[in-house]
Amino acid sequence: MAAGIRGRRLSAPLKPRPIASDAERFGYFKAGKMGLGWLVECDNAAQAETLRAAYPTYATLVPAYLSPYKGVYSSTFVRLPFPVFKEDWEAIESGLKQAGIQVPDKVRNMGHEAIRRAHERFLLSKLPNFGADAGGGYATGFLRDGYAPLPFQGVAIEYTRKMGYRGIIGDDMGLGKTMSGICVLFNASQGRKLIVTKNSLTPSFYARLKEWTGKTESEMAVAVSATGKARKGPGKHPGAHPEWLGLKKYNVPFDADIDRYEVLIVHYAILKKWLPRLLEWKPEAVVFDEAHTLCNPDSLLTQSARRLSEQVDSVVAMTGTPGSNRPRELFHLFDLVFPYRFGDFHHYGLRFCDAHLVKQPRTVFNKETGQRETKQVEVMDYDGASNLKELFYRLRATGMVRRLKNDVMAQIPFEDIPMVLPVSDEYWAQEEECVRKVQEARSKGETESLLSKLLLLAAEEKIKWASEWIPDFLENRNGPLVVFFHHNSVGDALREFARGKGIKTMCLYGNHKDDDFEHRFQTDEGVELALVSYAIGRDGLTLTRSAHMLLLEYSWVPGWIDQAKDRLRRYGQERLISYYCPYLEGTTDERVVECVVKKKDVLSAVMDNRSDTVLPHFGSM
């Protein structure tokens, strides 16, 4: 068909012309009752009839009075609509093939784009309105007087209820997912209920349940790995009481009778050990708190959680960072709550993880030579990201509710303060030597330990600066300072330094875990410094007595940094929060930050349908 024809009627008939290629057969048509679609020019009336008869549901012959070539080809044009579903497009393409017409790439691409847009509109129509009040479809009678979920929390409860009490509550950190999870738990079941969380958060969950629902020690307990059997040694006797075992009164040993409890709280470290007992106990509803812990399908922990979720009617996962690192993690979290909702992982990876074959070095044993050799082998790489908007819609429409702080509450102001640190000649020499070793080891696939050494070198260099900056900061600022880091050796160095300066310090890292850390930090005005590692203290804690945080090291996982920062940016915080972000310019330390910012931009597109502008120096961290 001639270019430029858009369904207009010609004033005079044109003579027949030869069709040079299949690409000339297709014209974009939009006019009156004809609607939107392709107008396909056929060689003759017989071919047009063959095309129309191949699928009468879709194809129509163009009436003579609407033919672009008036009076010439009145019956050799066939109108095909833009497809809405993949099956429609396959039927249209099959019919064209039967008529001897090949579909040009341009037409095929436009067809696929039409399908994508139609699918996006369909998903958008199913997207729940998370900003509206949910109404009164759920019960709150189990809560004590004076306690009730906020309207936006009610939306999450109602949405999960409509999904059959299965769902992912992915609200931003600090938005009260604990209240939402407890309400879903008690709405879903009148019988036994299970909460699985991190060890450091079990006392907090127990306290909230007791405060909000009025449950007593006879109705709920926290599971521990210890047993009630007698121990060897003087003064030890059988029939031990929990107090004798060094346990709190609400703890229940592994070999205790748990049938009398309505609510049981188990932490992830002992889930595998407790799994047989929990399956016998037969809970009717389970909440997985901090569910991003369950994103590794090969771990025994995730496999135990999967076995448990398959035996329970109601399963709710709660996490402020549903995708801590890459889109591939979302599949395993969704598959835990909604088995097979996304099909198999490989097809998910092809669609949303930009899966492709890459060559990687692998050490293999050569039987002929009796030695180990390094070979390049092809493996499937699922670490990428693709079709993020479609993934966002599918997540929201099929089981996940997520709101950011700015969506549901007055914005808590905060600022990222980048701090460029001087780099010593000694550090430059050490980094140069380490980089050289990394390049040599790259072909052998042995770079991981050397990269860790590079990061530790940067951390040690920043400790020298921190030992001068922290005392000046505490002297001139109001309120305590929270320091986050990755390596335990960094915490040890800061702890010894603070002790020498007489700075009252609390620790939560490695082997240094102060009892009742959160409560003491929030109430003891004498505490000036808190040393916290990402591994232990990045989630669940409320540290709103401080409005200042020093991110001395950066995690490879952007979700960990967000979790750490949200220890201060929570309900109850009324001051401007300052995050101090020191980095060694031009070094590996700065390149780590660039990598983390790019990762976070991808995750923002998936989880929140937005792509943050990557600002220089921590603008979107």
Located regions from the model:
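Charged, low-complexity
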Residues: 5-6, 10-17, 27, 38-42, ...
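Walker A/P-loop
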Residues: 164-184
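SF2 helicase motor core recognition
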Residues: 178, 271-276, 323-327, 490-495, ...
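Conserved Walker A/P-loop ATP-binding site and its immediately adjacent core
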Residues: 180, 191-211, 324-329, 486-488
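Conserved P-loop NTPase motor "coupling/switch" region that bridges the ATPase
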Residues: 190-193, 211-217, 221-252, 260, ...
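Conserved helicase ATPase core of P-loop NTP-dependent helicases/translocases
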Residues: 252, 480-484, 492-495, 499-537
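Conserved helicase/translocase motor-coupling segment
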Residues: 406-504
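A conserved SF2-helicase RecA2
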Residues: 556-621
